[in-house]
Amino acid sequence: MSSNINLLDTDEIPTWIMAWSQLMTQQFDPQHADTLRAQQTIQQLCLSLQQGNSCLTVTAQQAHCLATLVTQANSTQDEQPQAIFPFIYDQYHDLYLYRYWALEQRLAQHIVRLKQQDIEQIDLAQHAHLLQDRYQKAALQMVATQALSLITGGPGTGKTYTLARIIAVLNQANPNIRIAMAAPTGKAAQRMKEALQNSFGDPALKALVTERLQQQETLTLHRLLGMGHQARPRFHARQPLPFDVIVIDEASMLDLQLATFLFDAVPEQCRIILLGDAQQLASVDVGSVLDDLQHIEALADNRVHLQHSRRFKEGALIGKMAKWIQALDSKVSASQAVVQFEQDIVCANVLEKIMLDQDMPDVIQLEYLKADYTHVQLHDYEQKLILGYRTYFDQLAD
């Protein structure tokens, strides 16, 4: 993910960033204007990294100011530069630290590998009844035919419900299937386990869920990869994970390095399912992998976004507010947002058309009768109101 950072006052830049930019340019002529521009560009890149972006969009002139510190990424080959430079400038005008550029290249190669990989197809004819929602059905179809699957959706759209049925179908197709389920944090892994166990108890899955599947463990991603205190995974490209299916919940929390380590360890003929909502939990470190992957056109067949939320009623104000916040332009000021919210959500829901029952107009008229109405006029209204209940009176009389 790239970003554009406007120049900031030096008072707003952390001291360590200032010091590092000066250290990187210590061999430059301190009197030359390009030296200051180079330092400013480095500072902007560091600020962008702090915000979770892996690169910064800059002009060719800004990149040129970095002189011997930067090299141009090869636009026609996937090969890495012959020599290692601190910074990489690619054909999309994005400036990287070499480390994050190299991680993105590795991850991209694994995505291409999985996209092109032929996987054993699963016949879903006998499982058509398991899911009714067309998007959930599409998710099952995708996993049955693709090695890489991205299942996204907001709260209450049935991600875990759908996953339970997907896993049950895969388990029925291959009773000896080896499944790994993990999440970036221990808390997320525990929630995943509890939610799946509840879903596996559905009577509709009774014939598909085995005792082994009911006892399926969930791990943290670090434990799955065998990462110790030195953050070096025990499983990698030369020693891949021993699983046929790998499921990662809360995948929005995957940063660039962790995602690359994960995909390094995905073996051939393995299905990997990323489950999450990019609008919710974000990664702590650099890179928002799930959000970036779901916007790649070439992966359209590898992604299903669940649409229908069952957490609140259709048209509920809380749902409208959530969608409004997600669509809000991040550049809008707080005061503008409040005014816009009042216009779009609050005022729009104050006046609602009310459909009255047949007898309600008479009730309303009685409530708003003038105080000086005569007894005769009031009696006429009462008789008119009673007509609506004549059938009930007759039945009681009988």
Model-derived segments and spans:
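Interdomain "pre-motor" coupling segment immediately N-terminal to P-loop NTPase/helicase cores
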Residues: Q62-I122
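N-terminal pre-P-loop "Q-motif" helix
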Residues: L130-T145
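Hydrophobic anchor at the beta1->P-loop junction of P-loop NTPases
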Residues: I151, M181
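Conserved lysine of the Walker
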Residues: K159
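Hydrophobic positions on the alpha1 helix immediately C-terminal to the Walker A/P-loop
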Residues: T162, I166
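Inter-Walker segment of RecA-like/P-loop motor cores
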Residues: A183-P242
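Walker B catalytic acidic pair
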Residues: D249-E250, G276
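Conserved helicase motor core of P-loop NTPases
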Residues: Q279, S283-D398
